[in-house]
A protein has these predicted regions:
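Weak global preference for isoleucine
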Residues: 9, 13, 24-27, 31, ...
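Donor/substrate-binding cores of folate-linked one-carbon enzymes
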Residues: 1-88
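Active-site-lining helix/loop region of Rossmann-like oxidoreductase modules
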Residues: 66-125, 131
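A generic structural signal for well-ordered coil/turn residues at beta-strand boundaries
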Residues: 18-21, 32-33, 38, 93-95, ...
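Short secondary-structure boundary/capping segments
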Residues: 14, 28, 89-91, 122, ...
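An anion-binding loop in the catalytic cleft
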Residues: 101-179
Length: 179
């Protein structure tokens, strides 16, 4: 696998990977080391960590069901992992998921998509802490997209937009602290 460590799903979202996947592996001595005999991939685009986790679990289950008979009959070819393609997926820190108006709208949306109940995307709204549960990019070329100043939250047509260094993103769901 490309990502090894505590948070591979969140890391692939934060880094903007197009695809991710699962591997059927022999257990090695290190984290996610060992040869693999089967792999399957799926698209990352637009999925949050919970959705991607579920999709990968289903994909892994299907791959295992397909691979087990081949393993039992010794019909698999084992492939050594290319260590040069490996990236460490460190545990997500709370600071990494704090929304930052000086970052791009895309980076902030990725923070929201990579977040979870245990590591939420956070920001300050009217001086109070809040979790941003869902967000999406907006098409700035669209005439309906509002111009929002960096660091400002703005409501247009019943929708909430957060201004960033390169435009804005739409805040779709918020959970205030203590709720």
């Amino acid at each position: 696998p490309r990502w090894r460590g505590a948070a591979p799903i969140q890391r692939c979202i934060l880094e903007g990977d197009d695809v991710t996947g699962v591997s059927i592996m022999r257990i090695g001595h290190g984290i996610d080391t060992g040869d693999y005999c089967a792999q399957a991939t799926c698209s990352v685009s637009g999925k949050n960590a919970d959705q991607l986790t579920q999709e990968l679990a289903n994909l892994g289950g299907d791959l295992l069901v397909d691979t087990l008979p081949k393993l039992a009959s010794h019909e698999v070819a084992w492939t050594v992992q290319d260590e040069g393609l490996v990236t460490h997926a460190a545990k997500i820190s709370k600071a990494e998921l704090k929304l930052d108006p000086s970052a791009s709208a895309l980076d902030n949306v990725r923070r929201v998509l990579a977040s979870s109940d245990t590591a939420p995307a956070r920001c300050e709204l009217v001086g109070k802490g809040a979790r941003i549960v869902d967000a999406s990019l907006i098409d700035m070329a669209d005439g309906a997209a509002p111009s929002v100043q960096q660091g400002v939250l703005s409501v247009h047509g019943g929708r909430v937009f957060a201004g960033c260094t390169d435009g804005a993103f739409e805040v779709l769901s918020v959970k205030p602290d203590g709720k």
